[in-house]
C-alpha cells in the first residue's frame, strides 16, 4: 500500500476525556484510513498543556506508523494552521444552575475566536466537526466568524444520537447493528432531537413494521434523546468514548463517503430542505461522495414527523436568536 502525503488534523480540548479516547484512534487510522498518515495539531487551554504533554508522550509510545508528527499549542492560530480536518471538542460544560443563555455565552467566548482562527489559517477545504455542546449552535458561531470559508465546511455532531438510535433498535429487534439502515436524526443534539424510523429498515424490511408504534413514540424516541443524561447518571461522568467513536464515524464518512444506498445523520447548514429555516445547523439525512455531503431529498414527512422536525428547529432558532443578541452571529 503506497502512503499518501500526511494531512493535518486539529483537535481542541485534546487533553480532555473525549480527546483521550479520540486521538489514539485517529493515529491508528480509524478515521481516515490505513493509508493516510496524519499530523495531529492539538489545542488546549494553558493550564492543561502539562496534561496534554502526557497524552503526547503516550501517543509517541504507541509508535503508530501513520502518526507523522504531533504539535501542541494554546494558540488556535498555531493549532489550526493549514488544518485539513478540525475536531472542535473543547467546550464549556453546563454547570448546575446555569441557564441556556449563560451556556451559549460562555461557549461563544470559545467558538468565536476559534472560528476566526480557522478562517484565517486553516486549509480552504477544511472539514470542521463541532463536538463540544451545544454543538449545533457552537458550529453556527464558528461558521459565522469564518466568512472566508465555505459555510458547508462547518458541521455539528449528531452521529452519537444516530449510533444510539441504531443500537436501541438493534436491541429491541434482536438484529445486528449492521442489519439496520437509514435511521435519521433530525435537528438539534439535544432532548428535542427527532430519531426517525419512518425510512429505516431492519434486514431489508421496514423498521416500523417490526416494532410497536407505542414503543416507538413513548419509549424509543425519549430513550435515544435522553441517553446522554442516563450515562451521566450511571457513570458519574458524561459519555466520552462513545462520543469519540461517533466523531470518528462522522469524519470517516465525510472524508471517505457513505455506502451505496445508505445514509447517515450530520448536523449541517440547512439550505431550506424539508422546510427547515435556511442557515440553521440542523441534523439531516445525508449521503457523501468525493468528500461532499448532500441532503437526501424526497423523503415522505408524516404529520407526526413534521411536528417533531419543527419543534427541534424552533429550539435551534431560539438558540440562534440568543447568540445573535450576544453579538456572536449575524
UniProtKB/Swiss-Prot annotation:
The keyword NAD applies. The active site is at 189 (proton acceptor). GO terms for molecular function: L-malate dehydrogenase (NAD+) activity. The keyword NAD applies. It is an enzyme of class 1 (oxidoreductase). NAD(+) binds at residues 13-19, 107, 114, 131-133. Pfam families: Ldh_1_C, Ldh_1_N. Transmembrane segments: none annotated. InterPro entries: L-lactate/malate_DH (IPR001557), Lactate/malate_DH_C (IPR022383), Lactate/malate_DH_N (IPR001236), Lactate_DH/Glyco_Ohase_4_C (IPR015955), Malate_DH_type2 (IPR010945), NAD(P)-bd_dom_sf (IPR036291). Substrate binds at residues 94, 100, 133, 164. Catalyzes the reversible oxidation of malate to oxaloacetate. NCBIfam families: MalateDH-SF1, PRK05442.1. This is Malate dehydrogenase. It comes from Deinococcus radiodurans (strain ATCC 13939 / DSM 20539 / JCM 16871 / CCUG 27074 / LMG 4051 / NBRC 15346 / NCIMB 9279 / VKM B-1422 / R1). The lineage of its organism: Bacteria, Thermotogati, Deinococcota, Deinococci, Deinococcales.
Amino acid at each position: 500500500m503506497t502512503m499518501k502525503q500526511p494531512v493535518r488534523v486539529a483537535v481542541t480540548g485534546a487533553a480532555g476525556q473525549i480527546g483521550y479516547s479520540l486521538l489514539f484512534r485517529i493515529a491508528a487510522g480509524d478515521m481516515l484510513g490505513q493509508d493516510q498518515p496524519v499530523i495531529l495539531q492539538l489545542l488546549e487551554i494553558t493550564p492543561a498543556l502539562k496534561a496534554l504533554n502526557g497524552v503526547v508522550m503516550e501517543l509517541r509510545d504507541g509508535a503508530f506508523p501513520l502518526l507523522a508528527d504531533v504539535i501542541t499549542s494554546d494558540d488556535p492560530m498555531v493549532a489550526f494552521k493549514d488544518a485539513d480536518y478540525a475536531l472542535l471538542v473543547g467546550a464549556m460544560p453546563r454547570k448546575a444552575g446555569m441557564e441556556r443563555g449563560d451556556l451559549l455565552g460562555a461557549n461563544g467566548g470559545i467558538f468565536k475566536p476559534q472560528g476566526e482562527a480557522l478562517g484565517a489559517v486553516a486549509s480552504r477545504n477544511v472539514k470542521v466537526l463541532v463536538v463540544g455542546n451545544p454543538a449545533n449552535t457552537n458550529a453556527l458561531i464558528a461558521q459565522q466568524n469564518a466568512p472566508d470559508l465555505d459555510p458547508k465546511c462547518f458541521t455539528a455532531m449528531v452521529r452519537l444520537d444516530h449510533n444510539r438510535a441504531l443500537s436501541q433498535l438493534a436491541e429491541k429487534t434482536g438484529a445486528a447493528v449492521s442489519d439496520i439502515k437509514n435511521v435519521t436524526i433530525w435537528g438539534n443534539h439535544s432532548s428535542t432531537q427527532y430519531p426517525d424510523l419512518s425510512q429505516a429498515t431492519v434486514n431489508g424490511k421496514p423498521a416500523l413494521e417490526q416494532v410497536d408504534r407505542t414503543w416507538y413514540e413513548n419509549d424509543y424516541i425519549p430513550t435515544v434523546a435522553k441517553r446522554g443524561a442516563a450515562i451521566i447518571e450511571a457513570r458519574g461522568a458524561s459519555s466520552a468514548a462513545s462520543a469519540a467513536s461517533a466523531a470518528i464515524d462522522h469524519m470517516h464518512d465525510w472524508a471517505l463517503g457513505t455506502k451505496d444506498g445508505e445514509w447517515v445523520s450530520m448536523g449541517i447548514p440547512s439550505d431550506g430542505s424539508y422546510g427547515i429555516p435556511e442557515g440553521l445547523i440542523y441534523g439531516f439525512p445525508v449521503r457523501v461522495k468525493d468528500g461532499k455531503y448532500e441532503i437526501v431529498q424526497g423523503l415522505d414527512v408524516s404529520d407526526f414527523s413534521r411536528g417533531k422536525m419543527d419543534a427541534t428547529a424552533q429550539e435551534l432558532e431560539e438558540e440562534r436568536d440568543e447568540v445573535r443578541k450576544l453579538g456572536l452571529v449575524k
